[in-house]
Amino acid sequence: GWIRDFGKRIERVGQHTRDATIQTIAVAQQAANVAATLKG
C-alpha cells in the first residue's frame, strides 16, 4: 500500500540525512584538528 511506500521513502531520507550529518561532523572535527595544529 501507499503507507508502506511512504514509510520506505522516509526511511531512505532519514538514512541520507544521517550519513550527511556524520560526514559534516567528520569534516568539522578535521577542521578543528587542523586549526589546533596551526595554533600549535
Curated annotation (Swiss-Prot):
Any Pfam family hit: Cecropin
Coiled coil feature spans: none
Keywords carried by this UniProt record: Antibiotic, Antimicrobial, Immunity, Innate immunity, Secreted
Chief localization: secreted
UniProt-listed PROSITE patterns: CECROPIN (PS00268)
Gene Ontology cellular component list: extracellular space
Keyword check for 4Fe-4S: no
Superkingdom to which the source organism belongs: Eukaryota
A GO biological process held by the record: defense response to Gram-positive bacterium
Places the protein is found: Secreted
Family in the record: Belongs to the cecropin family.
Function: Sarcotoxins, which are potent bactericidal proteins, are produced in response to injury. They are cytotoxic to both Gram-positive and Gram-negative bacteria.
Protein name: Sarcotoxin-1D
Gene source species: Sarcophaga peregrina (Flesh fly)
